[in-house]
Amino acid sequence: PVTIQGVADNNPAQPFTPVTQHQRPGLLLMDGVVYAAFGAHCDAPPFRGWVVGVSTAGQIRAMFSTRAGDAAASGNGIWHSGSGLVSDRAGSIVFATGNAFGNGSPSTPIPGSTPPPDLGQTVARVTVQPDGTLRATDFFTPFDALTLDAADVDLGAGGPVSLQQAYFGTPAHPNLSLEIGKQGYLYVIDADNMGGSQQGPGGGDLLVNRLGPFGGVWGRPGVWPGDGGYVYIPYNQGSMGVYQYGLDGTGKPT
């Protein structure tokens, strides 16, 4: 066994405090490293979202914090209601975060290619660096992240899903990801350009599409690529939404 301890690679002033961290999402094994994500125990501070990489040889390779802008602040946990971390390309990990508790969510216009140090209410991509550490390289935060935060409507109650390019996507957006959380909107994200914060028209979202709202999700959608492609969404009220993939008149996935 390996004891996870140490400080964040992206903020050495921020220690990992295991007594208030909870490892809920499914693990990811990638290139000989097991990646585990952490959130809170019922939001008891201090906690942050973490992605920790431990090699199969038993060495800690990465400790990435989603709340690196303020070493003392809490928030931005990764919990996904148990659904796992996602890798949709070599050396890359995608996850979603929950409540930021104040100033921990991007709330100004920021391009996706320049992620800020605090990533609350966000779908984020981190990339493995030559030294094994992780660096945020792309992200999407809904324009109304502060409203979600105030109402305890975690985006990260649901985990992200990567869609297979051979069955989904368009010429303009060949690689797609999905995210849906407590609010019930299904965000269709360009996985190559995730959208940043307030990069759309009028300061809105830069997305391939936003569908819904449907019921809130504590989990993540399932995907069937056959028969034209289907997405299955498990709503929190006990029902299952079944949606066939298609394109609208403008070529957007629906």
In which residue ranges do the predicted regions lie?
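Noncatalytic, solvent-exposed loop/strand surfaces
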Residues: P1-T254
